[in-house]
Amino acid sequence: ALSDLESGIGGEVTSSGMAAVTLIANTLRLNSKVILPHDCYGGTIRLFTSLKEKGVLDVYFTDQSDLIALEKTFEEINPDLVWIETPSNPLLQVVDIEQIAQKAKLHHSLVVVDNTFLSPVLQNPLLLGADIVMHSSTKYINGHSDIVGGAVITNNEEILTDLKFWANNLGITGAPFDSYLTLRGLRTLSIRMEKHEKNAAAIVELLSNSDKIKTVYYPGLLNH
């Protein structure tokens, strides 16, 4: 069901969001070059930094909103994989998936998008040129705060085969009952995301008008 919502051909359900990140990382070859956003989720930063320190991967953190600087990094290292997180966690920085994916294809780089914060209701990375989309289904996808889970989805048969191989090897697939509860959550995802947007807008308006608040980070603001 989640694969259909993301316009993928299949994927793997994992035991957590970080298990999804770990699964993708394990599909890479030794010394693969990876570009990540400088402000992505802390767990993602810690994992890839540790893999860099162990000499497993070559990892480069960049400001992906600066397309000129990003293009320079592409030219310098010719990455094997580009990791995108938009909006980013926690500062909600927004980048253009389609533009970055186009640049990545020129360098034959795979593109992964962490779509946790928007869900397939509001953003479909595979339709914008990404090869893989991942989620921490613990959050919006499930929406009931009663499971921990993740998911990795692709529109490429070769990548899908690799994902299934490594998910089985690592033993990080999701539990059946957690998957059942997540499927329940998917049934109300569209309605919940609509309400989340309305609630967030109301909170942002309140905070923006308070003289006690210095800065509000929210993609819906014109000055974001």
Predicted regions and their residues:
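Conserved PLP-enzyme active-site core in the AAT-like
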Residues: G11-K212, Y217, L222-N223
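Aromatic- and Gly/Pro-rich amphipathic surface segment
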Residues: A1-E6
